[in-house]
């Protein structure tokens, strides 16, 4: 990028889209931004609180004026009173990174390098593949084939740049997704030709599916004499990863990370898929991207690896990441060489931040310190409010029970998978993100944390370290040794999650034939049952001269001064209406009972 080239400011883009939604009726349309109380809604749409409460009473919902209505309930009331409605998203410091749309014109866009994450089962050759690609000896010095560090680097193939995020197993990938980061464009899934699909292979596929990231399969160890390619294809097709040779959509590359066989084909396949994905960005704007890793150095302070996904990052730029801001002091490429700027699709090592951002934090770059500082301050102040909004929003969505199954043998895992899926109801969907064999591990905890899942462990010993990690991540692990107990537990959960629907059915009518006053209680109505029956604590409507006067419930039911459970037609009883004393002889009472509607 030329030094004289002026970058488009992110400040103007964000300021233009920050908006406060004014809750009001405009041209017959009720505009609102989220939940509100009955009292607030009544005032805004100019109807009485009683009208709204009565509406929900007939829906078998006993609300008061301070009850907070969900967005769906607000929509119901609007329809009931003849109003159109529109929910508008309020954009402020707390959510601008998620809600602001950075719209670049087509003429300003140019292709950017793809960002790749390599995943696979331990010892299937992931580290060896990365090592061969970057031509270092890291793999030789690492224990157990498990990567001991994180970061990102670039390779050049036939004049094209390809970015690789080097992560320890699946954890970093999942942590980033947990924080809402969409940084990976393509996953390269490494599967050993002599070993086939293993538990971590399935985990990687589930992670990719949950993040909606396409997969290229690299069948490794093709130099081994006991390779079985057909087995690999069959096992992967059972997991919806189907080779193009069989009419599927997944590219399969065959090779050896040890000898380098197939690496060029892998690069070509990555570039082909990247072209299909049309990965483009605008280099002539201030930067937007994701934090890959960050750590505190005893001499240099915070050192962070950032992936620039749009725009160009330069020294002295101010960035907001997470809930703080800082200024870039230096830029280095992943080889440790100083650079002047980092265009889209570039991993870059930066210094100058006075805090340590978290992996997966999105960042925005600015030229104005005042604006960056203000945004960071407001984001920090609204963090708790923002979390509350997210929780409330999730409560209004379709209810889903997310489950991860781990068992000691494959047959049990499959049986549990099949049985549990059948326990879903019309209101509650059961989503089994992963089922596998073996102990619960860190990847399971992270997947559960990301997807708000419960882990069911059958006939397994859970290591203390895993239990501690689960507790810290607020992930539930439920241990069982009897299948039917898991089934019973999930049935109860589904029932508890579903919105129980009731139908308010009229069960009787009565006439007030006498009234009395007791100072400790209030008005007592002497009634005669004209039809049906009255039962203890039933809901009632009080009618006078064909007008509805009150909706509520009876607080007591007595015959001959003795409490009774119910009173049948033709009999008399005394009752007090809860928090209501304005009764008259001749008033009619209608009794109602909530009846649960079966799905």
UniProtKB/Swiss-Prot annotation:
Residues 256-258 are annotated as: G5. Residues 111-278 form the tr-type G domain. Residues 166-169 are annotated as: G3. It is found in: Cytoplasm. Residues 145-149 are annotated as: G2. Residues 220-223 are annotated as: G4. GTP binds at residues 120-127, 166-170, 220-223. Keywords: Cytoplasm, GTP-binding, Initiation factor, Nucleotide-binding, Protein biosynthesis. One of its GO terms (molecular function) is GTP binding. GO terms for cellular component: cytosol. Residues 120-127 are annotated as: G1. PROSITE patterns: G_TR_2 (PS51722). One of the essential components for the initiation of protein synthesis. Protects formylmethionyl-tRNA from spontaneous hydrolysis and promotes its binding to the 30S ribosomal subunits. Also involved in the hydrolysis of GTP during the formation of the 70S ribosomal complex. Belongs to the TRAFAC class translation factor GTPase superfamily. Classic translation factor GTPase family. IF-2 subfamily. This is Translation initiation factor IF-2. It comes from Mesomycoplasma hyopneumoniae (strain J / ATCC 25934 / NCTC 10110).
